[in-house]
């Protein structure tokens, strides 16, 4: 008898609970920030590498001015080397989870960044761009850092193109 028992209840709870997206920092004075109207979706084949890294870095750099979403039909635990590499920049990868790509989500996006995903599934009329970047999952620490830095540079350039100011570091 399917649909009953503790496993079915847990599955229903997961299905009814909205997916957690990249957290939006607070607005100051203890108040939550308003949800940004601008959305960028990073669409990947699975969510253990590129798309989650890109969403995390864009959210980190945007400081709540852009909602960065990692979307993938398959969500897996992130590679520990990838999480460690992001932690070196002060980015907590555990704050970013994947959502299933839906037409409604993609319609809300100002831009859909495709990372190893079949573009044929996207339909027409969406602003998209391809980021051809190696998947960092399963690679050594040095390779992961290089990939992370390449994604970070692209994320920063994207924010500049969107007109979102990026704070500079003092030298």
Outline where the language-model segments fall.
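Conserved active-site segments centered on acidic
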Residues: 3, 12-101
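Flexible domain-boundary/linker segments
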Residues: 71, 75, 85, 99, ...
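Short, polar loop motifs at secondary-structure junctions
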Residues: 113-120
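Phosphate-binding/catalytic loops
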Residues: 3, 10-32, 120-171
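A short, aliphatic-rich alpha-helical micro-motif
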Residues: 106-107
């Amino acid at each position: 008898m399917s649909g009953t028992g503790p496993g079915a209840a847990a599955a229903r709870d997961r299905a009814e609970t909205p997916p957690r997206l990249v957290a939006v920092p607070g607005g100051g004075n203890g108040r939550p920030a308003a949800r940004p109207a601008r959305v960028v979706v990073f669409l990947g084949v699975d969510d253990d590498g590129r798309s989650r890294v890109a969403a995390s870095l864009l959210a980190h750099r945007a400081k709540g001015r852009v909602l960065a979403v990692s979307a993938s039909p398959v969500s897996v635990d992130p590679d520990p080397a990838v999480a460690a590499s992001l932690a070196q920049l002060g980015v907590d990868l555990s704050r970013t989870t994947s959502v299933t790509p839906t037409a409604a989500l993609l319609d809300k996006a100002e831009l859909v960044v495709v990372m190893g995903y079949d573009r044929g599934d996207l339909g027409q009329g969406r602003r998209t761009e391809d980021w051809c970047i190696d998947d960092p999952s399963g690679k050594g620490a040095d390779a992961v850092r290089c990939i992370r830095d390449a994604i970070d540079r692209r994320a920063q350039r994207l924010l500049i193109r969107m007109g979102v100011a990026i704070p500079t570091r003092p030298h």
